Amino acid sequence: MSDTKSGDDKTLSVTPMKTLTLKRPGMEQGTVRQNFSHGRTKSVVVETKKRKFSLPGDKPEPAAAAPVPVFTPKPPVAAAPVVQEAPKAAPPPPPRAPVERSGMVLNELSRSEMEARRRALEGSKVREVEDRQRAAEEAKRRAEDEERRKREREESARRQAEEEARLQAEAESRRRAEEEARRRAPLAAELATADEEEEVKPKRAGAGAPVRRLVTPEVARPAKPTKGEEDRRRGKLTLNSALSDEDARARSLSSMRRRQEKFKRAMHNEPREKVMREVILPETITIQELAQRMSERAVDVVKFFMKQGQILKPGDVIDADTAELVATEFGHTVRRVAESDIEEGLFNIADNAEDLVPRPPVVTIMGHVDHGKTSLLDAIRNANVVSGEAGGITQHIGAYQVEKNGQKITFIDTPGHAAFTAMRARGAQATDIAILVVAADDSVMPQTIESISHAKAAGVPIIVAINKIDKHDADPQKVRSELLRHEVFVESMGGEVLDVEVSATKGTNLDKLLEAILLQAEILDLKANPDRTAEGVVIEAQLDKGRGPVATVLVQTGTLMPGDILVAGNEWGRVRALVNDRGEQIKEAPPAMPVEVLGLQGTPLAGDRFAVVNNEARAREITEYRQRLAREKAVAKHAGQRGSLEQMMSQLQTSGLKEFPLVIKGDVQGSIEAINAALDKLGTDEVRARIVHAGAGAITESDVSLAETSGAAIIGFNVRANVQARAAAAAAGIEIRYYSIIYNLVDDVKAALSGLLSPERRETFIGNAEILEIFDITKVGKIAGCRVTEGKVERGAGVRLIRDNVVIHEGTLKTLKRFKDEVSEVPGGQECGMAFQNYEDMRVGDIIECFRVEMVTRTL
């Protein structure tokens, strides 16, 4: 089949009648004759729609249709300045008509008229001032409006200039794209249906004039006939198949798609602008992840490291400093985050002032041991706590709440023994007011001074309670005078510290003490927000046999309720129950209330802060982070202490350090902490107590196995061993010792450490002897003839040979004779013969010093 265009045919012929139609602009109409097989032809009317393009240097063709209005940005027209019209002067008031005077004229005005005129005059003055102020404000407002309009005009001009620049840039990019598309489109794509021979004619007729054909990229290029085209037209030929042109080969969809993609690539071939990002960097990150966060290729990052002299792989881990350097080099900004950011928002959440309500004060009772702290608290609570403590000594932190006259006060009782320094420090940090109990008959003692230091370090006010004033030797004035030395100035001495003389046994002045506490609390203006998640501090923790881990906590803000998810130190759990100081289960714990919390997964450390979180996932993340941090610190500590095996052995040999291993189990965490601190103080350069394991809870079979492996002794403080542990200890021959008073425990460990000390070598002087003559006896050797000048000389004692006040030899006597008889000792003033063991270099005039050596057992 071939197509011929009838537009160039000049043969005279009769053409059939055509329909009268209007020619559309931009359309070229012609007739194409199609030749089929067997000599058949077919005429087809073809309309070619041309798209107009403007090339550089072309003259615009006259438009056939009405021109379409084109938007052209107009230059900004400066707004006419607003001229503020001056306020017109008020027209003068019309002249008043003369008032006709009556026949009777008063010589002077009345007092009421004078007052009315005076008020009118003052009112006019006030109105004048107000008018001037309004005029000034109006002028200021007009100036501000003018300045605002000026800024708006400048902003409008700037936006219009930016819009013009943007339009010019878009037009330039569009022009470049069209030129690129025109350059790449082949010239043959113009005629989709023209024959090859018909294409040559216009080229010849045009001589040298170039023929410009504009094509659009969207027009599909006609398929060239292939060799096998005639072979495909086989089979039975029908009239329908002969007259239809469905057998013509069409362009495939994939070819059209490839052409469109090629055109898009040509359009978007311009260089892209690099996007700068904010890269979030953790403490460690891999190179691959860093490249993804920067939207860069990992190969480029590896190349950067190669330029710096480092050969790394995309999977290698780098630190935050190196990652920040790389990100900055690639032009990105960096925001570093730490692993500890997971704890952000856990504590110290700010509360609104309108949400705060008054709360009870938290009072800590501090002082020296046996000064009556717990007895004073008993008198306030009308209970008996001392009888429950072993030896009458407080060994735990007790938290109680007392209600007096409708107002609640929370008391925290701390131990006064020297071993419980950490407990006193924790009590001072969790309190609002510190009550310093000083016995009137004992005055200021070391733990009293330490309690003062803890209270000052915590920044809490002090109330001095001078106890035991009922005793005959009580001297409260002496207590006040000694407190001055430690910068505690009571009111009677001209200071600001409140002091109350009380007697815990007789209940004297307890009301005054409570009034002083409430007065100090009113001055402090203690408030908290109960309508939020709870926060506080762990006062004590223990492992109860029937209830599991139990933590005594003090709620400082918020309200703690059963079901809350609690995070305390390295442990977390869901609150199963809340128990108050009287052993009753409660539904909620408001601020400043001490409660026992059940439901934790482990025993937290005393002094840890606790907080309530939203879900278990966050609680687990926080505790895992803290546990990992604690493990890393422990590993670093042991790594620094361990060193190599040779160094450790040489250090032990040179120092001669002996260790006493112990496995300690206690009832509460605070007692374990106090025992550890007390045993650490017993250590010296020669011996020390090494605590293999310390924990809260009963003694178990695993503790016995650990003690057997390490050769340690087992100590139980207010706990007992179960049946399996006792059987295992009896089989292994390990002694288990039980204690209820920390004094006895420390004394026994001190005695055991003293037994590890090597005995002390102590010398006792016996006497001196002077050598008068040297005798050389056959088969015996040299014998020194001496006279005892001081003390006496004993056989078997240690001797030193001194010449010119210098010790020449130290050894023992081989023989001691008087005349020819062996004697055990020679008194002073007598002569004798002496010989040394394995030494004969003696001279006349030497001094022989005799002494006795004793080995004395040492104690710590």
UniProtKB/Swiss-Prot annotation:
Q: What is this protein called?
A: Translation initiation factor IF-2
Location of region: G1: 367-374
Query: Region G3: start and end of each range?
Result: 413-416
Q: What HAMAP family is this protein classified in?
A: IF_2_B
Q: List the disulfide bonds.
A: none
Residue ranges, annotated region (Disordered): 1-265
Q: Which domain of life is it from?
A: Bacteria
The record places domain tr-type G at: 358-525
Q: Which UniProt keywords apply?
A: Cytoplasm, GTP-binding, Initiation factor, Nucleotide-binding, Protein biosynthesis
Ranked from the top, the taxonomy reads: Bacteria, Pseudomonadati, Pseudomonadota, Alphaproteobacteria, Hyphomicrobiales
Residues binding GTP are 367-374, 413-417, 467-470
G4: region residues: 467-470
> Which residue ranges are recorded for the region named G5?
503-505
Basic and acidic residues bias: where?
A: 1-11, 110-183
Gene Ontology MF, one: translation initiation factor activity
Q: Where in the cell is it found?
A: Cytoplasm
Does the record's keyword annotation contain GTP-binding? yes
